[in-house]
Amino acid sequence: MSSSVTSAKVAVNGVHLHYQQTGEGEHAVLLLPGMLGSGETDFGPQIKNLNKKLFTVVAWDPRGYGHSRPPDRDFPMDFLERDAKDAVDLMKTLNFKKVSLLGWSDGGITALIAAAKYPLYINKMVIWGANAYMTDEDEKIYQGIRDVSKWSEKTRKPLETLYGYDYFAKTCEKWVDGMQQFKHLPDGNICKHLLPLVQCPTLIVHGEKDPLVPRPHIDFIHKHVKGSRLHLMPEGKHNLHLRFADEFNKLVEDFLQ
């Protein structure tokens, strides 16, 4: 059984996207990272421990993140739609016929958009830490993380190592501004209109102590993605898949089978 992880870059939609791949199972699974995220910083325990006999696991770095640079990351109004198309086109380029999605935070939003827009290509989906719209409360939360010098050392360090301080700090500010754009749309809409179009079996995991995603966001997605299942982790915060990796991985494996 090979536990090796390969990394490569492949040309997709005019950029070179970096990804890591492991396992040799029939069932292809794409890991979608959060803001400023990458496979290596966001999904260590999943790349290492998800069942390699059952799954072929791919973790991608969205354009401008991780090792998918250049280009520098930017945030046009449709940046999440662009990520969704890039992600699906990456997996098609790698010759996967169908794929399940594991999306964290922004990656969860990207997964929802991909499942809605490319329903025939998506097998199953697990999302956590995502939101379908922006509120005043969210705006305050995001302003609170705008200045990376105020982040905890533990959260900041891996990203600083990956990007260098300047790119990391600048891109975080750009991300906050990028998210603000949704405040100007009716109801702060990010992807509300797409939720009813999701057809695949969907598991929503929520850490009840997540400081970044208030509970109403989760209930909204659960209500509007038909047939979705909600699993609550009472002690989970935003990074529940890292903090409670074994519990999370088992949950995911059971759901995907």
Give a label for each model feature.
Residues 15-70:
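Conserved HGGG/HGGXW glycine-rich cap/lid loop of the alpha/beta-hydrolase fold
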Residues 44, 59-98, 102, 250:
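Active-site loop/oxyanion-hole signature of alpha/beta-hydrolase fold enzymes
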Residues 109-154:
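Flexible "cap/lid" loop of the alpha/beta hydrolase fold
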Residues 177-194:
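Active-site nucleophile elbow and catalytic-triad environment of alpha/beta-hydrolase enzymes
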Residues 198, 204-206:
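Short beta-strand/loop motif that positions the catalytic acidic residue
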Residues 209-213, 238:
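Acidic catalytic loop of the alpha/beta-hydrolase fold
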Residues 222-239, 254:
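Catalytic histidine neighborhood in serine/cysteine hydrolases
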Residues 236-249:
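Catalytic histidine-centered segment of alpha/beta-hydrolase-like enzymes
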